[in-house]
Amino acid sequence: MQSFLKSPIGVVLAAFLATLLVGLIVLRATGSSLGGLALGWGKAADTGTPSAPAPLVPDASGFNAARIIDDEVFYDSQAMTREEIAAFVARVNAGCQPGSDGTECLATATFSVQARPASTFCPGGIEAASGVSAADVIWEVSQACDINPQVLLVLIHKEQGLLTASGASLSARDYEAAAGYACPDHGACDPQWAGFPSQLYGAASQFHRYRLDPGSYDVVAQRPTRIAYSPDAQCGSGEVTVANQATAGLYNYTPFQPNEAAAHGGDQCTSWGNWNFYGYFKTLFGSPTSA
């Protein structure tokens, strides 16, 4: 055997085998598609970063603390059809991976919807149903409560990032507190309002409470009001005379305004809620205020 290896043929063969071995090692180490196809390593790509929806960047250019969104936009329940909502959710949520706890992505999740009788705040009422998609929940609530479905879409993203939540950033809590309604930041939601359908219905009905009984709330349209910059009282407040009911409702729902630092990346006193509502709405649907 040793004499064969020392012969010219043996040397050439040994060199060839060594070269082949090195090539195979390199192909496998680099995850080459050629290696995967030729050698059955088709799962090599599984070790890469899972795909995820494209991130949404809020466009807050033109933000006006006194006029975040026009009434005509906020209460336009016909802004999108059921089919348009479904197509929108499928598009922005494309690439989503289920959460590590098994939570389904927004585009594929389904929910049981509780019956809601017609009320002063949501005159349309809602019928009980099961296996309802997120898009259909949004449509049903928008029609029952006379609110723009775009507002609900922006709200669930501003509160929980649900339009693009994926993998490690997606959990059951995101649906439980989808709209931030009756849910303290660091505590459990009121069980009566926990869950995606109840969150949307509760938030939509609350915005009409603000509209129908404005004097019972802190921020009233056309009345000068000091609005805090942060939950930290040391960050101060600024006077705002909001232009319309929709903007007043947003401040009653999220009682902080962005400070000047928000336009430059923010600081320890920046509250992003209403800034992001405006910014995400503009990114996704165009300006929420007329020129």
Predicted regions and their residues:
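Non-catalytic cell-wall polysaccharide-engagement segments
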Residues: 2-19, 23-92, 182-291
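Hydrophobic/aromatic-lined pockets within catalytic cores
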Residues: 157-164, 208-212
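Solvent-exposed, acidic/flexible segments
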Residues: 78, 127-135, 144-149, 171-174, ...
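Short, solvent-exposed secondary-structure capping/transition elements
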Residues: 150-153, 164-169, 216
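Residue-level detector of functional hotspots within protein domains
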Residues: 59-60, 133, 167
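Export/targeting segments at the very N-terminus of extracytoplasmic proteins
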Residues: 73-160
